[in-house]
């Protein structure tokens, strides 16, 4: 494909130019041009101006010392290892578009790159300028970009040509998606960049999907005693939709992917790591036992009244020690049956009590005891 400069559609180009004149150059508003530019772009422009930057400033990409490259590689070994197979796959999807993949850490420092477009033309030179491990592509270094805005907003973005703050970076078009680690913290972002290329906003979807794949690999690599694969009943699970939870020997959630956080409506972060008991109305010992059987898929009630399908597995890579012995205690089984009856009765305790042939007071007492205690295997 030719690397000739391709402008965005006329309407969008005019809106971008008008927004730049109004916000960056202080021109009085004569239209609603700025309303056609995404709010997160305007916020980034404002941050650049507050930092004393001017659009016409020259942006240079200095050589990176070998020692700095080694330090970056060492610090991000786990991220790069998880991302590289994903980058190889997505690079096949964009091979004919003159776009390429860039992986950064949470500070916008390049930690890995995909294959670059062939050539010795100006576009290839621009690509090589940024596609080097150790290059700083943060907002403080290069202004508004998909990298800086994805990290600042922690949302996937698409950015084309004149939406970059600096004139020197207006040759780039890029899609970006943030990356979140198993504990829920932002650990970097995945960027798909083209130079003087056709506008491809659909790459935002590819970047987002690929970022979720990288996150899933990181969760699968997280040391744990038990790993839970979650899906909704009747909905086939897949890499893009399956929830993943890492559980330690004490029943604490030690890692999760984005799908699990959404399905369980929980942050599942290091600062808010719930017990398995807080999520599932089922004894943890039963999940460990199902993992030992190896092929069990359970339909598990949540405290919200919803149900999820859970496929428990023994802890994977890096898990210390063997899976502890786990046998459900009688009181745990009893409590689980009561929870199930309440869930089946859609929260109607009186109806659940009638079904079980026990008093409502007994139902309340058993539920409270099960909720307050922490179930551990063994």
Predicted segments with their positions:
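N-terminal capping loop/helix in small sensory signaling domains highlighted by a polar->aromatic N-x2-3-F motif
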Residues: 114, 255-267
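Intrinsically disordered, low-complexity terminal regulatory regions
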Residues: 1-141, 145-161, 171, 180-250, ...
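PAS-family sensory/regulatory domains
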Residues: 133-135, 270-282
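PAS-family sensory/regulatory modules and their coupling/dimerization elements
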Residues: 162-163, 171-176, 278-325
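Extended hydrophobic-aromatic, low-complexity segments
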Residues: 256, 272, 351-354
């Amino acid at each position: 494909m030719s690397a000739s400069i391709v402008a965005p559609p006329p309407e969008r180009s005019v809106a971008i130019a008008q927004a730049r004149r109004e916000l960056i150059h202080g021109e009085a508003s004569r239209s609603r041009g700025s309303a056609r530019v995404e709010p997160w772009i305007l916020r980034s422009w404002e941050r650049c101006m507050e930092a004393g930057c001017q659009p016409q400033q020259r942006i240079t990409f200095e050589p990176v010392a070998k020692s700095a490259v080694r330090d970056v590689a060492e610090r991000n070994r786990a991220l790069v290892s998880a991302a590289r197979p994903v980058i190889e796959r997505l690079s096949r999807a964009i091979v004919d578009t003159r776009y390429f993949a860039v992986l950064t850490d949470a500070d916008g420092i390049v930690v890995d790159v995909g294959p670059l477009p062939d050539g010795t033309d100006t576009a290839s030179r621009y690509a090589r300028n940024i596609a080097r491990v150790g290059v700083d592509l943060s907002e403080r270094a290069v202004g508004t970009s998909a990298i800086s805005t994805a990290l600042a907003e922690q949302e996937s973005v698409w950015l084309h040509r004149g939406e970059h703050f600096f004139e020197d970076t207006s040759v780039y078009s890029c899609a970006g998606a943030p990356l979140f680690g198993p504990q829920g913290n932002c650990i970097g972002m995945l960027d798909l960049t083209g130079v003087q290329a056709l506008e491809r906003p659909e790459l935002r979807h590819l970047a987002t999907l690929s970022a979720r794949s990288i996150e899933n690999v990181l969760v699968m690599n997280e040391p744990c005693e038990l790993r839970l694969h979650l899906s909704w009943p009747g909905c086939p699970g897949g890499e893009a939709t399956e929830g993943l939870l890492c559980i330690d020997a004490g029943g604490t959630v030690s890692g999760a992917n984005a799908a699990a956080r959404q399905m369980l409506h929980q942050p599942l972060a290091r600062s808010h790591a719930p017990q398995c008991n807080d999520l599932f109305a089922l004894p943890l010992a039963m999940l460990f036992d199902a993992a030992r059987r190896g092929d069990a898929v359970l339909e598990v009630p949540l405290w919200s009244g919803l149900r999820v399908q859970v496929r428990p597995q023994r802890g994977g890579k890096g898990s210390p020690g063997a899976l502890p012995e786990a046998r459900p205690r009688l009181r745990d089984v009893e409590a689980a049956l009561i929870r199930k009856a309440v869930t089946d009765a859609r929260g109607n305790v009186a109806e659940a009590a009638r079904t079980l042939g026990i008093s409502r007071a007994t139902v309340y007492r058993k539920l409270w005891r099960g909720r307050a205690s922490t179930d551990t295997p063994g």
